[in-house]
Curated annotation (Swiss-Prot):
It is an enzyme of class 2 (transferase). It comes from Methanobrevibacter smithii (strain ATCC 35061 / DSM 861 / OCM 144 / PS). S-adenosyl-L-methionine binds at residues 40, 70, 88, 115-116. Belongs to the class I-like SAM-binding methyltransferase superfamily. Trm1 family. Zn(2+) binds at residues 248, 251, 268, 271. The gene is trm1. This is tRNA (guanine(26)-N(2))-dimethyltransferase.
Length: 388
């Protein structure tokens, strides 16, 4: 440890030290990403909410420990935590993980140096929470996570390969997630749904099902919090939420087609142009209103450096919990209609006056999630634009 210049940071109630580096990279001697503090703060609330829901001590696996910040915070800041298992293939990372455990005077944290998938299989059924936060895609580790996850456990998954999931690079998404993406105005939501669908299909091999408690797309990454259930019947029901999205890039019509082996339409019923499909992906709920509400309440009991941003994000996710898949970008619609964009609040207000539900989305500040048909949305936008 003496060969590096040491940096000290504090997150929540936890202090850690690690080698200072010029830029965030997987080549750093020990990985620490300051931009993921929001992610870790949200995780503290999610795991505490899960622990209280289960009403028992929980054992946690931090699969990619890096500096140890995530695993150490879990033990230091969450009530009802039994053992924390921190794993990293790097010997240098292991040294700093042990150092940071001692720095915070913690017990019941074990440090391991194993291949991630091998580590999970060595400890099958021992974890109540498995947190997969890799540098890049989580895809190679989800099979082992699915095989090893216990009944009524929590699976937390981060993906930083957003260019693949969002459809900027189609082939990597097909290769890693067995799904075709599409780069639309709602591509970040599509990416979340592709990731959730891949998790569901992977766990189904082991007669396990998923319930998405919270998901968000923030900056350079996507994050899922998934409760894992066991049983073949539950798994069969779960797979009914897998399907495809059909999208028209000419008029912005879209529709859901549930079913892994379902037929999908080729022609847009609105304008007659060719439809583009994305999937297979998850068409079930990607936010759980009750769980998120409990997380918001839990924030009152926690010291979080990013609390303001955390609460803003959680409230947005809570509001969109019951809304349909995908959203409409008002400016994109106006561009197609070749009209000026009205104020967003007026669009919301007029949709609600017409008896439709309409909420904002954390995926896009210009997005509207609504159960109104596209024709009605365009009609309202045209009327408002002409009266500007």
């Amino acid at each position: 440890m003496d060969e590096y210049k040491i940096k000290t940071v504090e997150e929540g109630l936890t202090k850690i030290q690690f080698p200072e580096f010029d830029k965030i990279s997987s080549d750093a001697p020990v990985f620490y990403n300051p931009h993921m503090e929001l992610n870790r703060d949200i995780s503290i609330l999610a795991l505490q909410t899960f622990q209280k829901q289960e009403d028992r001590n929980i054992n946690i696996c931090d699969l990619f420990g890096g500096s140890g910040i995530r695993g150490v915070r879990y033990k230091n800041e969450i009530d009802g935590v039994g053992h924390v298992f921190i794993n990293d293939i790097s010997e240098t990372a292991n040294e700093y993980e042990r150092h940071n455990v001692e720095l915070n005077n913690l017990k019941d944290i074990e440090i391991f140096q194993h291949d991630a998938s091998m580590f999970l299989r060595m400890h099958r059924g021992e974890f109540d929470v498995i947190d997969i936060d890799p540098f890049g895609t989580p895809s190679p580790f989800l099979d082992s996570a699915g095989y090893c996850s216990r009944r009524n456990s929590l699976l937390c998954v981060t993906a930083t390969d957003t260019s693949a999931l969002c459809g900027t690079y189609k082939e990597p998404c097909i290769r890693k997630y067995n799904a075709k993406p599409y780069k639309s105005e709602y591509c970040h939501e599509t990416g979340i749904r592709i990731l959730a669908g891949f998790v569901a299909l992977t766990l189904a091999k082991y007669s396990k099902s998923i319930e998405v408690k919270l998901s968000h797309s923030t900056e350079h990454y996507m994050r899922l919090y998934i409760e894992v259930k066991k049983g073949s019947k539950k798994s069969d029901e779960c797979l009914k939420n897998i399907g495809y999205l059909s999208h028209c890039k000419h008029c912005l019509y879209r529709e859901e087609n549930k079913g892994l082996a379902t037929s999908t339409p080729d022609i847009c019923p609105e304008c007659g142009e060719k439809l583009i499909q994305a999937g297979p992906l998850w068409l079930g709920e990607i936010q759980n209103e009750e769980f998120i509400s409990k997380m918001i309440v839990e924030s009152e009991n926690k010291k979080l450096n990013t609390k303001e941003d955390v609460l803003k994000l959680l409230e947005s996710c809570r509001i969109e919990a019951k809304s349909p898949a995908t959203f409409y970008d008002v400016h994109k619609i106006c561009k197609i209609l070749k009209i000026s964009a009205p104020k967003l609040d007026l669009v919301f207000g007029n949709l609600e006056k017409e008896g439709f539900e309409a909420v904002k989305t954390h995926f896009n500040p210009l997005g509207i999630k609504t159960n109104a048909p596209l024709k009605k949305i365009k009609e309202i936008i045209k009327t408002l634009s002409s009266s500007n």
